[in-house]
Design a protein with these regions (language model features):
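Active-site PLP attachment segment
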Residues: 1-35, 42-53
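Short, contiguous, pocket-lining structural segments
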Residues: 6-8, 42-50, 65-68, 72, ...
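Short secondary-structure boundary/capping segments
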Residues: 14-17, 58, 170
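Conserved PLP-dependent catalytic core of the aminotransferase class-I/II
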Residues: 31-32, 58-96
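Amphipathic alpha-helix from the class-I
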Residues: 52-65, 158-162
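Conserved C-terminal alpha-helix-loop-beta "cap" of PLP-dependent enzymes
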Residues: 78-192, 196-283
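Terminal helix/beta-alpha structural elements that buttress the NAD(P)+-binding lobe
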Residues: 284-297
Length: 298
């Protein structure tokens, strides 16, 4: 767990949790094996500054008014749940696509099916990247990440009530400039967040088509692929080839395709869509994302 993500701790600080509450006692993981591997990679000169930072963050959290933070979060989520076009991911997504629970401190807002009505350009599709850009440029709010049709804002106990209100103001103002495609009654009536229970296009719609639900078949090990001769081909022509490079969106930095994996047609379609929507697709040596390096056939 990266402590520095949501707690007041210095960058690089993190914890490794080991669950040790098995029925009858003991840990679910092999602690001796974990220790053996840790000794291979950890420094023999730990940073006392970083360790003290972790302890200080724990001390601060023990003395903070978490109840007040929780109330402010629920107030914000209730407000965002009334948006007519943008949609807040809420508890209804639990149980779908492997989702086990919901962290209410993460504000995930979907733009799917919405568009910005512009007098000059007509109806313009509204993407996650577009929402992310508007929040940054016009409202000076930096999101944690954006996808093709969503943004994620991470709140912490260090956020003030005024700061959370600013986020709510920005999203509701943007929502007032949008319209929605289709005949989604929830949107027309402005009734609540996405719950996935009374609207087939609701909770499921938040994750449908996610590239992370796809799996690329492995043709060879990553090490073998990295040592093979490679060549560059047009990204659009790479379906059916063995990738010689990583392709990922950062954040979060989870590989979409890794060296040694077959580039499938469906995965390529999503990568091209993300590229064309201006998402931060990274990994290939060609920063323009026009080409990708693939493993040459023998």
């Amino acid at each position: 767990q990266s402590v520095h993500k949501t707690l007041p701790s210095l960058t690089q600080t993190a914890l490794l949790h080991i669950k040790c509450n098995r029925p009858g006692g003991g840990c679910y993981a092999d602690r001796e094996r974990i220790d053996r591997y840790l000794h291979m990679v950890q420094s023999s000169s730990p940073s006392y500054l970083l360790m003290a930072s972790i302890e200080n963050s724990i001390f601060q959290m023990e003395h903070m008014d978490m109840m007040s933070y929780g109330r402010q979060l629920h107030k914000l989520r209730s407000r965002l749940g009334q948006m007519r076009h943008l949609r807040l991911a809420d508890t209804g997504i639990i149980g779908q696509a492997g989702i086990k629970d919901l962290d209410i401190s993460k504000i995930v807002v979907s733009t799917r099916g919405t568009y910005l009505v512009s007098q000059e350009n007509g109806d313009t599709g509204f993407t996650g990247a577009r929402l992310d850009d508007i929040l940054r440029r016009e409202y000076h709010l930096e999101m944690e990440m954006c996808g093709a049709d969503y943004v994620t804002a991470i709140t912490t106990a260090m956020d003030s009530a005024q700061g959370l209100e600013r986020l709510g103001d920005a999203l509701t103002r943007i929502d007032s400039c949008l319209a929605s495609r289709g005949s989604d009654a929830r949107r027309k009536n402005g009734k609540g967040p996405v719950t996935g229970t009374d609207d087939k296009s609701g909770g499921e719609d938040m994750h449908r088509g996610s590239v992370y639900s796809m799996r690329c078949d492995t043709a060879m090990s990553m090490g073998e692929a990295m040592d093979r001769n490679m060549k560059s081909v047009g990204l659009e022509d790479s379906a059916g080839c063995i990738s010689g490079e990583f392709v990922y969106i950062y954040p979060p930095g989870i590989p979409i395709v890794a060296p040694g994996e077959w580039i499938s047609g469906p995965t390529l379609e999503v990568i091209l869509e993300y590229r064309d929507k201006g998402l931060p697709v990274q990994g290939p040596a060609d920063k323009s994302l026009r080409t990708i390096r693939i493993v040459q056939k023998d």
